[in-house]
Amino acid sequence: MDGQETSGPGPGYPPYWEADVVLSDGGTAHVRPIRPDDADRLVTFFHRWSAETVYRRFFTVRSELTPAEIERFVNVDHHDRVAILAELGGEMVALARYDRLPDSNEAEVAFVVEDAHQGRGLGSVLLEHLAAAARERGVGSFLAEVLPGNRQMVGVFTDAGYVARREYGDGVVRLSFPIERTELSESVMRSREHRAEARSVERLLVPHSVAVIGASREQGSIGRRLLDNLLIGDFAGEVYAVNAAGGEIGGHTAYRSVCDVPGDVDLALVATPAATVLDVVEDCARKGVKGLVIVSSGFAETGAEGLALQRQVVATARANGMRVVGPNCLGVINTDPEIRLNATLAPASPGRGRVGFFCHAGALGIAILEQVEARGLGLSTFVSAGNRADVSGNDMLQLWQEDPATDVVLLYLESFGNPRKFGRIARRVARRKPVVAVKGARSLTGPPAWLAGSGVRANDTAVDELFRQSGVIRVETLTALFDTAVLLAHQPLPAGRNVAVVGNSAALALLAADACVASGLEVAVSVDVGAEGTAEEFREALGRTLSREDVDAVVTVFVPGLTQPEPDLAGVLSDVTFDATKPVVSTFYGFLGVAAPGSVPSYRSPEAGVQALARAVEYAEWRARPVGHVPDLEVDLSVAHAVLEQALLEQPDGGTLSAEETGRLLASYGIEVLPTVHADSADEAVAAAELAGYPVAVKSTSARLRHRTDIGSVHLDLHDAGSVAAAYEAVAMLGERTVGVQPMASGVATVVGLSDDASFGPLVSFGLAGVATDLLGDVGYRSLPLTDVDAAGLVRSVRAAPLLFGHRGDDPVDVDALEGLLLRLALLADRHPEVVGVELNPVLVATHGISVLSATVRVQPSPPSWDDEARRLG
């Protein structure tokens, strides 16, 4: 192929189409557009096809590609002719392409997957990426011709969630289908993403063989501790020691390289110096290792050079089918008695339990594991991700969603890699099981150094809203995390907010009752068995209280050392609540934890127990709410695309849209802005008012003054020419010679906005208009995607919301129309990443309908975000 190959990606190459992807078996591959220098790879790829694969692709038998075909296949324009390949270990293993038909928005497509990699989901992944590229380039439909016997390829198209039309003729099946995103295609993609990413993490946690690379003879060294912990924990599979010097370590043969290990290696624990890790990863690729846990330090936490090395290590691993935990991490644990994996630096593994735990910090992980043991929690699985260069909390949520061994999920997060994906997955997981999270690094102005390049620090308000919207229980400290976890792991969820207090100390009962009120709970009854109460009296009081229909949960408080020793009361508590359907928490002063699985958690203070209970109540209420959906709204995408494309041609660096552009863009999404006529004199203002019809409003057009009713820059409800002229002169006295004249609209004044948060992407905001709202910060936020339930919650989240619902005898306003506006704005933001800011201020909400009086839209050039278009890691 010498002489035909052109170096480099070629003109128009879209680098943001590149992605690492997870396949259906949990392995990884790299997806990218084809390049002219792929000619040799293409020929080698073709020569690995079976005769059947060749026939299915070309409908004929052939042994070679012609030079003209090769030239055409690798030279594309990335617009009307697009080809996307998947590569593994630097070799092409699958290829998909489309060719647009002349003067059409239809394109013919063709796919081929190498025989050795068929059945791994490569076809469906490439279809997602090819369709995303096609939509970006204005292609609306795909056409494909497939042999009737090629059921796998027919399935790639028909199982993707698209509605395909089939025709039979000339011995082939002709398929045609629109490629617009639909609820079904989105659901199919998310389901495949979930299964693939869960499987990729499962390969790390359920290995049949483990190699410790960097195992050492030196007691206490990192490599030796990893090896010893595997052996002490009685790992169920094969353990191999790898040391460059060879010999023997702890009675085990030490192999000089992982490539020398006689058996297969599923998981490699890497504990070699940072400078050697890339070579180790390449050896693991040659060996066929399925996953890596890199405990070595010296990467992103050390600065720019370490970050560059870390990225190279992860890219090499992913390109060769491997996921990575770390680097700079503590390791992973799986307490399944069939696995018994302690691949960490921690001296002891916690007992078996129903809790899955993910954390960032390596060193902190040891303290966390000690607390887990002290609280009697027990774990199903544990992952310390360190620098979190690859495997993240999102991956673990994918695994834990359907993991029958995990009932409660705990997260200690210091940054987010992909917050939008986190919100989407967490919302799904939290519908099944509680997710409790500590968001650390609040005091930092940026991401922690050890997470440089792999995440960004989110503003705290956005974090709160993301967690609340996703059903994640946010706590401030690790202590609160464990307080909440022991309750959720051992007690049922409360059905309501009514709490009973039962105990032998009036003082403690009062503290518990006060804590309930402070936490938003209702005290239904308080039962005091007295300081001299017996265990049987307590048994009877607790049983009677639990049977009350007006009680949803019970808080028990005890001072030890009275007539009954503490163990007797604890036993009674466990007996009475064994099959209870209501949660019970207790305070035994001097005792913390749980006696056994299913027993009642005990806290050092009533306040701690009540706060944990309150969190469980809020979570149960969230879970009981409808899931909601993103409604299918009618919009004019062609107009929106045209407005934005023209605006960015005129302002290549971005900027604010003109009033005319703003009106057209918003109208394409069903958001009408009340027309405004600008006037530069009193006579022009009167003429504009006569044209609009009285009453009218006259206001300054200055961004500084146009909302300042307090200083005379806004004049409302003007009914005649004289008042309009006077209003113009009043505004002119402020130094503004141009005013806006609008038809008068009425309603409660609100502000709707869209901002592009550096961490979370687009956030939709809502608040009531006015200085008081600004001063109090009474603004609510929601991240995308926005469901109808989210929109309703956003409107009701602000403290001033009662003004919308008939406050003090006023008529309630049209909240449905307001929620519809929020949904349309959210859809605009979701479809057009170029739109980075919108302010609708004010939006008047009347008893029937809404009026948008003023709108500002900011745009900036931005390559499409494919987070929601096609599966990708990162």
Language model features: what each stretch is:
Residues D2-R203, P207:
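Long, contiguous binding/interaction regions
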Residues E180-G874:
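Catalytic-core regions of core metabolic enzymes
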